[in-house]
């Protein structure tokens, strides 16, 4: 079982062997020998690529960042550029002044992110496969189950792009060999084993578990996304997803805010900063990577400055005016850029209110949608950004009296370890459907309700209504995972020798027609059932039964021609239009 936490800033991987009859993998091994990484220090490789002409990959991960300066990446006229954070281009968030430059790790306006994702995952897959075979020489590729995590904020389209990119990168296409897990699901799986640590002076070092907790919320705080999923826990310890939502925010947006609010003014304003991006792009990258390392020092009551290393490669390009101003404000220190404690907090404060608002909204939804004796509710922080003491403090103060805030013991690796546990034994029993899903049918026409333009008279004289929406599941319903919904359909005309199903979705809970505003086809293909072998039967006996089941991140349909028992299984690929 291999778990991959494909993150905006960094990517981690871990594995564990499957043991028959054992419900949990036990010891999980982290991959820590990424190309260009510091052994024993870098748990993750950077989600970065060094590309030439936007097609040829020159380097990936840490190596891409290390080789960028010597390759003149990002310089005027250079065909080479360093990109990272491209995952966020699948669901970009408008941001004032956003560009496709990758400073502080957010290339979130890429035109073709799927190409970059495929290229990066190809190198990850090949590296991990070689590492696994070094430990297990007789291991066959088809004996490995892979689990790649995705943000809960992603919709069907983004998850399908991710699955297609993984397949194109070499991950197996065999059913069940590649799972996609929502990042909060992975964190929740791990927390059930690792336990939690409560936040705040009133809980110094206090540890706890999810045993006895009937409902809780996971706030997965990553580099580019804040994903929230709300759960209840059934009597067997399995998770029932109640609600989920996410936003494009996180640790790397703090970096972007520091650039806009602090560094741009210190280095001479917008125009001057744009000039520096042209003449010293990697020096600015290094400055912000230094901040990435040191921003963990920011606390609610910290007073010390954070000193960012001012390399000569940047200093020599600063204007005289900027150099003099820095010299005067920093007691003559010309080797660093000083960030005051208040300036550092201002970067966090540009991002945290959006997180608090989302948590507040989801906490209200959790209370509205469930009943529980647990008071106050548990809000569990996970992900790399959850290591921020300032974020923990702000959230604890905001929720004081309404919820207890906790973190997982190792926020940086709980998603990847949870991905291994998820692959080993998925514990999500049910999910709340984000959409109403269904298919198009002809139903009996109702005069006074259905428009005459939809009236269809069959060859047998029946008055039918075209374009009716036949529902598989309604938006907001709790849907058991992999438990099929069964529906039976018959042809409209005696001459029909095939039955074609087109699949639709909408946010509307009770849609009547498939052409209602907001209804859309969501699959890349229709499903056609050949009725030739049943044409000798009465019309009612030419029925087709659909078995529709909702998997962890996909919809599966099995159609059966009842007269012969012939099956037409398919996994619906969500449209990436």
Please report, for each region that a protein language model flagged, where it lies by residue:
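Acidic low-complexity intrinsically disordered segments
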Residues: 235, 316-350, 354-355, 430-577
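Conserved helicase motor "Helicase C" RecA-like lobe of SF1/SF2 P-loop NTPases
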Residues: 161-165, 388-402
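Conserved phosphate-binding loops in N-terminal lobes of ATP-dependent enzymes
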Residues: 42-149, 295, 302, 327-330, ...
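Hydrophobic, small-residue-rich alpha-helical packing segments that form membrane-like cores
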Residues: 132, 152, 162-215, 221-222, ...
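Gly/Thr-rich phosphate-binding beta-strand-loop-beta motif of the actin/hexokinase/Hsp70
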Residues: 1-24, 79, 195-240, 540-562
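Glycine-rich phosphate-binding/hydrolytic loop that grips phosphoryl groups
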Residues: 178-198, 255-260, 350, 354, ...
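Early-domain small/polar-rich strand-loop-helix modules and first-structured segments
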Residues: 1-100, 238, 244-250, 256-259, ...
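Gly/charged contiguous loops adjacent to phosphate- or pyrophosphate-bearing nucleotide/cofactor binding elements
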Residues: 77-80, 87-94, 102, 112, ...
